[in-house]
Amino acid sequence: MKLEASCGTATSEVPKPEKKTARDAEPSSETRPQEVEAEPRSGSGPEAEAEPLDFVVATEREFEEVLAISGGIYGGLDYLPSRYHSWLRDPDRTVVLAKRNGGVIALESVNVIDAGETVLVEGLRVAPWERGKGVAGLLQRFCSQLVKRQHPGVKVARLTRDDQLGPRELKKYRLITKQGILLVRFNASALLAGLGARLAALRTSGTFSPLPTEAVSEAGGDVARLLLSPSVQRDVLPGGTIIQDWQPYRPSESNLRLLAAKGLEWRVDSRARPRVLTLCTRPFPIPHGGDGTWRYLNIDAFGSDGAQVQSQLLWHLQRQAPRLVGLNVMCQLFLEPQLWSQLADFCQVGLGLELVKGYTEQYLLEADI
């Protein structure tokens, strides 16, 4: 089903295709910064107006075309090849494509969360040959109007970005919170082979000794008790928000059900008096290297105790590495900005991981809709 749009004005409904009611067992989404054109440079762009765009609900048939417009995105860390099919099966999500002359030139996903009050904007990307023509602005405007019609209870739009915010973004969006981003890489087999000796050396030098950590069970209700606690929301969660692999959730019963379907692994310093909480998203393949040997591992850390973040990071690496033997891993750790240097040193000097790039930040933005 499609809509002709010569000026980016949505004038009729785009029905959502029937979807399976059961959620996919894999994590169904990953939020990322807006790709390339968060805003058109001027209005809708003269070239975008010259040739009408068709906005259509994405299907399995367009998968290869979506890959074709996504080459090189996020430096080989693109999640979409691993998420596209499960996105289409997500009953709370609509993936919209912009087409010109029958070919896919742009994509954006809108995902309704927070019990229907928030739309999460994800995955915006425009084909390299179409950038600078206002396509992104037209697609964003259409998706916003679509959400308003299909979900009248939605109050705000949220998105995450990792690029520097300019005056235009700060005027349009409220900054809810920010986290530091630490990106490292390693070979899982090599990490396992040398980890024992490295930890022994750290203990001997008095540099680091793992602190006790505790499991957090979703089935036993530990996750709900922690995340629905006012003190955890106030003192531990950044901006009172659970940010899971770039995707922000308000702490609520409905969102905890969404998170429970993703197979996350949680850790905390103390269930009785929590100060640091971490969660690890299941690793998935990424295009980096082009040989199928790379996986992406995402760990979100909440709290400001550096030694405890180190201990929980180590626990997650020890947990995941045996499952990734023979593979290379890009690991992104999100943490309090003031802890970045401490954790970067721990990862490089202590654990022998390779730092991929310097300090960057993840921004959580919000705007009324």
Curated annotation (Swiss-Prot):
Entry keywords, A to Z: Acyltransferase, Transferase
PROSITE patterns hit by this protein: GNAT
Biased composition (Basic and acidic residues): 15-26
Gene3D superfamilies the record matches: 3.40.630.30
InterPro entries: Acyl_CoA_acyltransferase, GNAT_dom, Hisat_C
Domain N-acetyltransferase: 53-188
Keyword match Transferase: yes
Enzyme Commission numbers on file: 2.3.1.-
Domain of life: Eukaryota
Record carries keyword Transferase: yes
Pfam families attached to this UniProt entry: Acetyltransf_1 (PF00583), Hisat_C (PF24066)
GO molecular function: acyltransferase activity, transferring groups other than amino-acyl groups
Location of region: Disordered: 1-49
Further details from the record: NAT16 is the ortholog of the ectothermic vertebrates enzyme HISAT (AC I3J7Q8) responsible for the synthesis of N-acetyl-histidine (NAH). NAT16 protein, unlike fish HISAT, has only trace enzyme activity for NAH synthesis.
Its job: Probable N-acetyltransferase. Shows only trace activity toward L-His and no N-acetyltransferase activity toward other amino acids. The physiological substrate of this enzyme is unknown.
Protein name: Probable N-acetyltransferase 16
